[in-house]
């Protein structure tokens, strides 16, 4: 699992850059089947969402499906935790 903040989000290309607490930047690609969960503000619980619900600056947890040859990762699921 990768934890960090979304520093760049490219919805058109289904990708993002996640910055970990140590400053490490990770390129993340989202498959069509990627599970997205976002905070539901009334209950402060997680609910199903879409890639378009994510925003730069959100703190997220990313489940890695695979690592590409260029070092980027393919995301299995992403959950917004802030």
Regions found by a protein language model. Give the residues of each.
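Short, flexible, surface-exposed loop segments at domain boundaries
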Residues: 1-27, 39-82
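Structured surface patches comprising rigid loops and adjacent beta-strands/short helices at the edges
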Residues: 31-39
């Amino acid at each position: 699992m990768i934890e960090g903040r979304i520093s760049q989000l490219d919805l058109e290309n289904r990708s993002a850059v996640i910055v970990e607490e140590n400053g490490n930047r990770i390129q993340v690609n989202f498959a069509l089947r990627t599970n997205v969960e976002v905070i539901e503000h009334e209950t402060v619980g997680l609910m199903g969402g879409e890639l378009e619900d994510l925003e730069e600056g959100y703190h997220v947890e990313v489940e890695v499906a695979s690592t590409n040859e260029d070092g980027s990762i393919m995301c299995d699921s992403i959950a917004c935790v802030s």
